[in-house]
Design a protein with these regions (language model features):
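A conserved FAD-binding loop/helix module that cradles the flavin
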Residues: 36, 425-447
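Rossmann-like flavin
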Residues: 75-156
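Mid-domain catalytic core of redox enzymes
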Residues: 174, 204-317
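C-terminal segments that line or cap access tunnels to active or ligand-binding sites in enzymes
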Residues: 274-380
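N-terminal glycine-rich phosphate/pyrophosphate-binding loop and immediately adjacent elements
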Residues: 1-102
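Helical element adjacent to the flavin cofactor pocket in flavoenzyme catalytic cores
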Residues: 163-218
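A glycine-rich dinucleotide-binding beta-alpha-beta segment and adjacent secondary-structure elements
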Residues: 138-148, 365-429
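Active-site-proximal substrate-binding core of FAD-dependent oxidoreductases
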Residues: 208, 448-453
């Protein structure tokens, strides 16, 4: 966005490849995604279409998921299918729950209220229970959100819930390829407009002089000067990069460091035998218990629900790799914090194996014999994400938003240092939709700053 406006942009990426949670990684001959599984609102006129069109991302091979069923939900001994399009979706839910027609009409109206200030101050769970009386329908309306946000009854704002659900009901899309395609497209766009992206540049310090950041210092000894600095690291990490500062107050640093974070994700990546399973153009969500608002894996290691996503096959009509995701609390892996990637202790590996076994058991209730189709597996935990992306507690969605105190949990892109800005999922909204909108807002604030100066 800034490069297109004529600014000279330099991106410093701490990892060997750019992209953060959008990137994919290679094992054997396959690429596996870390965070990009499907995207909502890419139809013309949809919530993300204009932004993606402007960024050149609509040139990528997006494939729409099944119109009649992009989410297949197995919960409470029944199967529910979500179709795309708000009207079709509401009608489908009415066919499952005809006695909830009035509440579902109100829910349909809610999906259009994505910019209402009142939603930031409204508890999502309390609002949903005020319009929906059937407890199973409440779970069906929430199930696909389990790996999109932290479904926490006590704190989740209605604003966050609706923004995480509505774009996908508009339309849902998978990329015919891996997340690196999206990352490469963005990098190419930056370079086409005169910018640059440098990898293996781990910023360890932001140097301040006369009330402004003047330099970014990297672990390899290199340094870079600029007029404006934008950090998409977690706000607590951003604050730690700034040394002694007369402008960045201790109370602000303390607030960023003490703010509760959302849970992380356990991901099980499966490589399947060739030709063993036909491709399914939808997600499968499977729940051991009919309560998706309390399902994060804790120290008991009980897996209560999973989401399954299949990669679009490059050739033929059979699945080659599947990702299985389930929420996981930081407390499960906290004792292993400080151990090194690929050199974790035996107990950590045993813990991952126990969780993976339960994920597979749930998956086999809807795909019988899946275990026999598997060639290889890999898995990651919140600790993996912390070590790669420096996200405190391996949080999947950044700061926990709280309806009861939105001013404390919704962070401004502006910091107390006039030329240091922040962006990313801890600010306004998380997810691909959220960080795109937040990035646009950050750019607006930078432009305001430039005009005022």
């Amino acid at each position: 966005m800034m490069a297109k406006e004529g600014r000279k942009v330099l991106v410093l990426e701490r990892q060997h490849q750019a992209g953060g949670c959008m990137q994919s990684y290679r094992r054997g001959r396959l690429n596996f995604d870390t965070g990009l599984h499907y995207v909502g609102g890419l139809e013309e006129g949809g919530q993300l279409y204009d932004a993606f069109e402007s960024l050149g991302l609509m040139t990528l091979p997006w494939k729409q998921m099944d119109a009649d069923c992009f989410e297949e939900i197995h919960i409470g001994g029944r199967t529910f299918r979500w179709p795309q399009g708000k009207k079709r979706f509401i009608n489908a839910m009415k066919s499952y729950f005809p006695e909830e027609e009035k509440g579902l009409d109100l829910y349909g109206e809610l999906l259009d209220c994505t910019d209402e200030l009142w939603m930031q101050k409204t508890n999502a769970w309390e609002y949903l229970t005020s319009i929906i009386s059937d407890p199973l329908l409440l779970q069906v309306l929430s199930a696909p959100a389990t790996c999109k946000m932290e479904l926490r009854k006590e704190t989740l704002p209605l604003f966050t819930y609706v923004h995480g659900i509505a774009p996908f009901i508009e339309s849902s899309w998978r990329l015919a390829g891996d997340g690196n395609m999206l990352v490469s497209c963005l990098v190419e766009q930056i370079r086409a407009y005169g910018g640059e992206v440098l990898t293996d540049k781990d910023v360890v310090s932001l140097k301040e002089e006369n009330g402004r950041i003047v330099q970014a210092l990297c672990a390899d000894g290199t340094s870079y000067e600029a007029g404006f600095f934008v950090s998409n690291a977690h706000p607590a990490v951003t604050c730690s990069l700034v040394g002694e500062s007369a402008l960045m107050k201790k109370v602000f640093r303390r607030r960023m460091g003490m703010q509760p974070n959302t849970f992380g994700i356990f991901t099980l990546h499966l490589q399947l035998r060739s030709g063993s399973l036909p491709y399914f153009n939808h997600n499968k969500l499977v729940f051991a218990e009919p309560d998706c608002w309390d399902m994060a894996v804790d120290k008991s290691l009980a897996v209560k629900g999973i989401m399954m996503s299949a990669r679009i096959p490059e050739k033929g009509g059979n699945v080659v790799n599947i990702d299985i995701l389930t929420p996981m609390l930081w407390e499960v892996v906290e004792e292993y914090d400080g151990t090194k990637l690929f050199h974790r202790p035996k107990a950590y590996k045993e813990m991952k194996a126990r969780v993976a076994e339960q994920c597979l058991a749930l998956a086999e209730t809807v795909i019988p014999g899946l275990g026999e189709m598997i060639l290889k597996t890999w898995s990651s935990t919140p600790l993996t994400y912390k070590d790669y992306n420096l996200t405190p507690e391996g949080s999947a969605f950044g700061f926990r938003k709280d309806f009861s105190n939105p001013m404390m949990t919704i962070v401004s892109p502006k910091t107390q240092i006039p030329n240091l800005f922040m962006t990313g999922q801890s600010l306004m909204l998380h997810g691909l939709h959220g960080v795109t909108m937040t990035a646009a807002y950050t750019c607006q604030e930078i432009n305001k700053n430039t005009i005022s100066e």
